[in-house]
């Protein structure tokens, strides 16, 4: 048997919402609170299912985008420690595709993005403003990537 996490979560949500919530309503006179709790649990499991499905892909995509940005940013920032770390980060690759390793890499890259953003804000040039705009676009895109689906999207 090959465990299918997505299918397991679908079945669990179906049981909670289709069987458990109505059963609580029939079994207990004052059950609205517990029914709500089980309903929220079901919705959280749907979110987990969605995140499980996209977890590695989202992190790989974001890490690649950050590295592409860092490759272009070195010339804007100039020489120095941040520039050297940007080059090193841009040349690195994610070879371990486990979610925990990708998340660790992502956290390091996002930390470097914060440093880059701070450095770029101190530079007075059109290239720096263009890079700053790119940083803001990536931050917005990063938020979009993390968005959970609405109930109809699952």
Predicted feature locations:
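Disorder-to-helix initiation segments
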Residues: 1-13
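C-terminal amphipathic alpha-helical interaction region
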Residues: 10-11, 30, 34, 63-154
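N-terminal interaction modules that seed assembly of large macromolecular complexes
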Residues: 10-64
